[in-house]
Amino acid sequence: MSQTFTKSQVAEHKDDKSMYIIIDDGVYDITNFLDDHPGGAKILKRMAGKDATKSFWKYHGKSVLEKYGTKLKVGTLAEAAKL
């Protein structure tokens, strides 16, 4: 089930128990993806709870989001957060 999050709600998910990131208007749970990330867990931990859109698109193409996004997406960013 997809949920709508505010930026402050996403910001609460920034520790080892629960890590969320924002990419475009999607919210992704990366908690169990840390060990699988080819670039290492360190960068994901640094972005946890934040908008990772710029960093993501700097290093990844659309195919990466298509491959992993469906598994990791837990919701969307609330309209009010898009300023």
UniProtKB/Swiss-Prot annotation:
Transmembrane segments: none annotated. The keyword Heme applies. One of its GO terms (cellular component) is intracellular membrane-bounded organelle. GO terms for molecular function: heme binding; metal ion binding. Heme binds at residues 37, 60. SUPFAM superfamilies: Cytochrome b5-like heme/steroid binding domain. The keyword Heme applies. This is Putative cytochrome b5 B11H24.095. It comes from Neurospora crassa (strain ATCC 24698 / 74-OR23-1A / CBS 708.71 / DSM 1257 / FGSC 987). The lineage of its organism: Eukaryota, Fungi, Dikarya, Ascomycota, Pezizomycotina.
